[in-house]
Amino acid sequence: MKLRVVWIGKTKESAIQTLTGEYLKRLSRYVATEGLEIGSEEALLKLKDRPGRTAPVLVLMDERGKQVGSEELANFLGYHRDQGVQDLIFAIGPSDGWQKETLKSATQVLSMGKMTLPHELARVVLLEQLYRGYTILTGHPYHGGH
């Protein structure tokens, strides 16, 4: 399986770039991982609908989505791994929210909670939670005590 974390827009803060790189590196110990900076929702839909490939599982992060805890996210990751999903995409959208067409194309819409976060910080939180999810699946002590 390949895990892709996609965000719209350029990264402005060097600290965010550093943390993004760190969590992508940590994730790569558990799953083939790629972080992608794209320019638009249309680019995300093109990535999702590439011809000749099995359709990926597309998870959109949105304030209106389903809220899940770390263990639930781990179960979600494990389920898709065990089902043989080849491409799992988590996407953080534009600041004005996802267009209806994009929301309709999603396999799942998840929320990181009711708090509003800057998109760059939301990316780091998502990457950390994905890393935590994989450590839960493998019994790594990272999650213990949290």
UniProtKB/Swiss-Prot annotation:
User: Keyword Ribonucleoprotein on this protein?
Assistant: no
Which cellular compartments is it found in? Cytoplasm
Q: Which UniProt keywords apply?
A: Cytoplasm, Methyltransferase, rRNA processing, S-adenosyl-L-methionine, Transferase
Q: Give me the reactions it catalyses.
A: pseudouridine(1915) in 23S rRNA + S-adenosyl-L-methionine = N(3)-methylpseudouridine(1915) in 23S rRNA + S-adenosyl-L-homocysteine + H(+)
Give the signal sequence positions: none
The EC number(s) attached to this protein equal 2.1.1.177
Function, as annotated: Specifically methylates the pseudouridine at position 1915 (m3Psi1915) in 23S rRNA.
The identity of this protein, by name, is Ribosomal RNA large subunit methyltransferase H
Biological classification of the source: Bacteria, Pseudomonadati, Acidobacteriota, Terriglobia, Terriglobales
